[in-house]
Amino acid sequence: MSTLLEKTRKVNRILQKTGIQPVDFNEMASILKDVIEANVYILSRKGKVLGYSILKDYGNDIFAQSKIIPEEYNDKLLRVTETLANDKGNLFKEDKILSDLILTIVPVNGGGDRLGTLVLSRGVKEFTDDDLILAEYGATVVGLEILRSKNEEIEDEARKRAVVQMALGTLSYSELEAIKNIFEELNGKEGLLVASKIADKVGITRSVIVNALRKFESAGIIESRSLGMKGTHIRVLNDKLLEELEKMKR
């Protein structure tokens, strides 16, 4: 039988992957399931099921069946501010399945904020002190991974915005006017462009429009496909483009 130290080391392996592989909350839940020997559910602060792993199927479990749990369930979880161990039939009295299970609820915190909730369930056997130590350590690891995924998202947003700003900076005045009018005409993330129509409207040549589109395409901001006489189909790949163009109108 694995000792507490051996089990802790298994959980710690999740951290060793940090920065090497994308966050996989199902894998994290699976590791916690194996070391704690319980069903494990990782939820975001808003009640989204980030990942889960089932040791034993107890029926139509709301946490496993939903991508986002009902708001009233999540509100109850968020009211749990410290580990609630071995709850049976108190927290979810109205739920026939959950009220028959032994639940342990561990808040997931990080950076001074509530990031989510770790929910553990069993049929009969209560959670021991060793189980609770592993659960709380697991919640800490989950919190670090949620923070990392949030930081990666922020970094990706900043990178996409920087690419758009640099591409806009390479445009001449005429090309910038062409781009503004093109996406005003499209009125969305994709559509059909008739270059001659824009050229007449802005008072520029078609070559200016072509050059502007090429710069954006080479930067990976848009993709375009010629439809011959019908025009050119344009699709926005970087959604920060529309945000930056909108700012220019203010």
From Swiss-Prot:
- DNA-binding feature ranges: 195-214
Q: Where is this region: GAF domain?
A: 1-147
Keyword Disulfide bond assigned to the entry: answer is no
Keyword Ion transport set for record: no
Where does it live in the cell? Cytoplasm
Which NCBIfam families does the UniProt record give? codY_Gpos, PRK04158.1
Q: Provide the Gene Ontology terms for cellular component.
A: cytoplasm
List all disulphide bridges recorded for this chain. Answer: none
Q: Give the gene that encodes this protein.
A: codY
* Keywords annotated in UniProt: Cytoplasm, DNA-binding, Repressor, Transcription, Transcription regulation
| Main function | DNA-binding global transcriptional regulator which is involved in the adaptive response to starvation and acts by directly or indirectly controlling the expression of numerous genes in response to nutrient availability. During rapid exponential growth, CodY is highly active and represses genes whose products allow adaptation to nutrient depletion.
Q: Where are the transmembrane segments?
A: none
Q: Which organism is it from?
A: Thermoanaerobacter sp. (strain X514)
Q: What is this protein called?
A: Global transcriptional regulator CodY
Chief place of localization = cytoplasm
Superkingdom, natural source: Bacteria
